[in-house]
């Protein structure tokens, strides 16, 4: 069964603004590039093609430099609209797609081959994100409408069942972690050995230790 991985990527200059107290704009861009290397590299070992869709020429140029297939968004689309465009692009050639964000750098720690095996036993495979989102979705192109956004995990399950599709939930810590906060950076440092993202954060002199405050982890930066 031919499989295409679809990775939507926001503009480098607009992404991860919640990390602005911790990382400068250029550092956030560097982290985004490192995470895209991790995600695309982990998927490329198990699928027939990795496709990056973006409205940002800089993103597309960088993805192309990594040897990835690129697709420019048509017009002003939201995330679901961009992904629908990407699925339509894949439909003539591929039997299924695996959709992942570009900010789950620990995906290589998960068993991607086992994740894809689940797709042979169900019409739709969903890996939840922390907070009720969706961090991985496997399905036939255009099998159902996409509902990425707040609480999309539950909306995708509902949408699939409304279409009469069988659903398999793949629960994985490594797939659930998307990067939005300084504490998430700490999780990468703790669990991301061998990833480009961890190496990048180490170069920026970030360290992590257990926190005695409200957060589980205390992430700091050496001078």
From Swiss-Prot:
Function: Guanylyltransferase that catalyzes the activation of (2S)-2-phospholactate (2-PL) as (2S)-lactyl-2-diphospho-5'-guanosine, via the condensation of 2-PL with GTP. It is involved in the biosynthesis of coenzyme F420, a hydride carrier cofactor.
Enzyme class: transferase
Known pathway: Cofactor biosynthesis; coenzyme F420 biosynthesis
GO biological process, one term: F420-0 metabolic process
Family to which this protein belongs: Belongs to the CofC family.
Pfam families: CofC
Gene, per the UniProt record: cofC
GO molecular function: GTP binding; phospholactate guanylyltransferase activity
EC number(s) stated in the UniProt entry for this protein: 2.7.7.68
Keywords assigned: GTP-binding, Nucleotide-binding, Nucleotidyltransferase, Transferase
Subunit comment: Homodimer.
Protein name, as recorded: 2-phospho-L-lactate guanylyltransferase
Keyword GTP-binding in record: yes
InterPro entries (alphabetical): CofC, Nucleotide-diphossugar_trans
Gene3D superfamilies recorded: 6.10.140.50, Spore Coat Polysaccharide Biosynthesis Protein SpsA, Chain A
Catalytic activity: (2S)-2-phospholactate + GTP + H(+) = (2S)-lactyl-2-diphospho-5'-guanosine + diphosphate
């Amino acid at each position: 069964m031919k499989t295409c991985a679809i990775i939507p990527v926001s503009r480098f200059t607009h992404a991860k603004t919640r990390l602005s107290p911790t990382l400068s704009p250029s550092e956030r861009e560097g982290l985004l590039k490192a995470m895209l290397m991790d995600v695309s590299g982990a998927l490329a070992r198990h699928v027939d093609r990795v496709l990056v869709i973006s409205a940002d020429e800089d993103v597309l140029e960088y993805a192309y430099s990594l040897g990835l297939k690129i697709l420019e968004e048509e017009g002003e689309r939201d995330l679901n609209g961009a992904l629908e465009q990407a699925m339509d692009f894949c439909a003539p050639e591929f039997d299924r797609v695996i959709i992942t964000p570009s900010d789950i750098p620990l995906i290589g720690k998960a068993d991607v081959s086992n994740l894809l095996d689940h797709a042979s036993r169900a019409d739709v495979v969903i890996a939840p994100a922390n907070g009720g989102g969706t961090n991985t979705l496997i399905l036939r192109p255009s099998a159902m409408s996409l509902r990425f956004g707040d609480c999309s995990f539950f909306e995708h399950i509902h949408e699939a069942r409304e279409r009469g599709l069988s659903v398999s939930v793949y629960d994985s810590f490594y797939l659930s972690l998307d990067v939005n906060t300084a504490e998430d950076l700490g999780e990468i440092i703790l669990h991301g050995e061998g990833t480009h993202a961890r190496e990048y954060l180490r170069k920026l002199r970030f360290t992590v230790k257990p926190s005695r405050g409200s957060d589980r982890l205390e992430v700091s930066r050496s001078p």
